[in-house]
Design a protein with these regions (language model features):
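Intrinsically disordered, low-complexity Pro/Gly/Ser/Thr-rich segments with frequent PxxP/GP/PP motifs
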Residues: 45-77
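Terminal connector regions
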Residues: 72-110
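Short, surface-exposed linear segments at secondary-structure transitions and domain or protein termini
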Residues: 39-42, 54-64, 103-110
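Residue-level preference for beta-strand/loop junctions
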Residues: 10-12, 29, 63-65, 78
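Short, solvent-exposed loop/turn segments enriched in Ser/Thr/Gly
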Residues: 12-17, 81
Length: 110
């Protein structure tokens, strides 16, 4: 996010877009999130909290929920991965794992 980033401090804001799709036959609700964020210096930050972007959406079978958020880093690139804690109306709670994805300033990494 160039308008929010300031390389003189340094602070870089990275936007990311997530789509959560309910591929089950049950209604499910996103209860909480966990993010594991690593900058290019190897520093790790862990973020936990209820829902995402202030919401705990419920999804019927086949429905999707999309959101965009951001992650500030002190370096030009990093990586994040995590878990969404989901609760179905009927059944046991489960974790939806988010595979690692890169956060990088365009053209800063080959």
């Amino acid at each position: 996010v160039p308008l929010r980033s300031d390389p003189t401090k340094p602070i870089y804001f990275f936007a990311y877009h997530i789509t959560i799709t309910n591929e089950s036959d049950n209604i499910i609700q996103l209860m909480s999130r966990y993010w594991h964020i690593t900058d290019s210096n190897g520093n790790v930050e862990e973020v936990r909290g209820p829902g995402v972007v202030g919401k705990q959406p419920s999804l019927k079978a086949g429905e999707a929920f999309e959101y965009t958020s951001f992650c500030p880093l002190p370096t030009e690139f990093g990586v994040m991965h995590g878990v969404f804690h989901m609760a179905p109306v009927d059944g046991d709670a489960f974790e939806a794992r988010i595979k690692p994805f890169k956060l990088a300033i365009p053209f800063s990494v080959n």
